């Protein structure tokens, strides 16, 4: 089965927040994405609410429950106590933990699974006890996969930012793709499932899907939102689904 597509709504939320107005509607755009065939919605609610607001979370949860019960809600963020409280309140199907500093513009690195084990392991245990599937943001580093598994997580999410940044250098892109592929191979061998996200496009997704055919999910926001300005949200979701292999 091809990788499922989760549409990250942060870029939509950031555009809305440029004005003190309710549009574009984060929930409304999420509805368009799901109606066009996306398998889920992702948000990263940061402490300063500079894009996704805490008030968006119950609306997205209700959208999925009431209109698209087959879809999944993925909430990602740094596992502070405030973040964990949000997760436990709004009950996403998946929680993706990222090692972000609150001031970061965007996620730009994965966990050090050995050094961060003491932090992650009890948090993963708490989330799993709550019934959540847990994914951990990961650099392309095959050596870290056993330690990732030992936290108790279900999945890793491969950070594909470097791969996406080589959009005009095919040799570097191919080299980074192989690093991602070897990390996925090690994750599968350790018993983990594999997601991927960051700077993925219809141009670079097919090669990623070919190298990692058992990829479970891709979470895409910036590139998908940029394409939606040209092709509309429904048309863009279709393009990304085809790039995944659907």
From Swiss-Prot:
Binding site for 1-deoxy-D-xylulose 5-phosphate: 46, 51, 106
Compartments, as annotated in UniProt: Cytoplasm
MF terms in GO: pyridoxine 5'-phosphate synthase activity
E.C. numbers: 2.6.99.2
Record's catalysed reaction(s): 3-amino-2-oxopropyl phosphate + 1-deoxy-D-xylulose 5-phosphate = pyridoxine 5'-phosphate + phosphate + 2 H2O + H(+)
Transmembrane segments: none
Pfam families: PdxJ
Binding site for 3-amino-2-oxopropyl phosphate: 8, 19, 199, 221-222
UniProt-annotated catalytic positions: 44, 76, 198
UniProt keywords, alphabetically: Cytoplasm, Pyridoxine biosynthesis, Transferase
Pathway: Cofactor biosynthesis; pyridoxine 5'-phosphate biosynthesis; pyridoxine 5'-phosphate from D-erythrose 4-phosphate: step 5/5
Record-linked PANTHER family: PYRIDOXINE 5'-PHOSPHATE SYNTHASE
Described function: Catalyzes the complicated ring closure reaction between the two acyclic compounds 1-deoxy-D-xylulose-5-phosphate (DXP) and 3-amino-2-oxopropyl phosphate (1-amino-acetone-3-phosphate or AAP) to form pyridoxine 5'-phosphate (PNP) and inorganic phosphate.
Name of the featured protein: Pyridoxine 5'-phosphate synthase
Organism, scientific name: Mesorhizobium japonicum (strain LMG 29417 / CECT 9101 / MAFF 303099) (Mesorhizobium loti (strain MAFF 303099))
């Amino acid at each position: 089965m091809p990788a499922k597509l989760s549409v990250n709504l942060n870029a939509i939320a950031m555009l809305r927040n440029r004005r003190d107005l309710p549009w574009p509607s984060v929930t409304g755009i999420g509805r368009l994405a799901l109606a066009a065939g996306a398998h889920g919605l992702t948000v990263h609610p940061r402490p300063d609410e500079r894009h996704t607001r805490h008030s968006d979370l119950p609306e997205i949860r209700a959208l999925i429950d009431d209109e698209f019960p087959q879809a999944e809600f993925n909430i990602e963020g740094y596992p502070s106590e405030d973040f964990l409280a949000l997760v436990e309140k709004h009950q996403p199907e998946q929680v993706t933990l990222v090692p972000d500093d609150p001031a970061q513009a965007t996620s730009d690195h994965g966990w050090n699974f050995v050094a961060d084990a003491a932090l992650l392991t009890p948090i993963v245990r708490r989330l799993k006890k709550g019934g959540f599937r847990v994914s951990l943001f990961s650099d392309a580093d095959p050596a870290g996969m056993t330690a990732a598994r030992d936290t108790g997580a279900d999945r890793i999410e491969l950070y594909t930012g470097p791969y996406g940044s080589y959009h005009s250098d095919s040799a570097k892109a191919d080299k980074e793709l192989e690093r991602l592929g070897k990390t996925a191979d090690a994750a599968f061998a350790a018993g983990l499932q594999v997601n991927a996200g960051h700077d993925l496009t219809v141009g670079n997704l097919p090669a990623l899907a070919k190298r990692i055919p058992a990829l479970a999910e891709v979470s895409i926001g910036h590139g998908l939102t940029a394409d939606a300005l040209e092709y509309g949200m429904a048309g863009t979701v279709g393009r990304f689904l085809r790039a995944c292999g659907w």
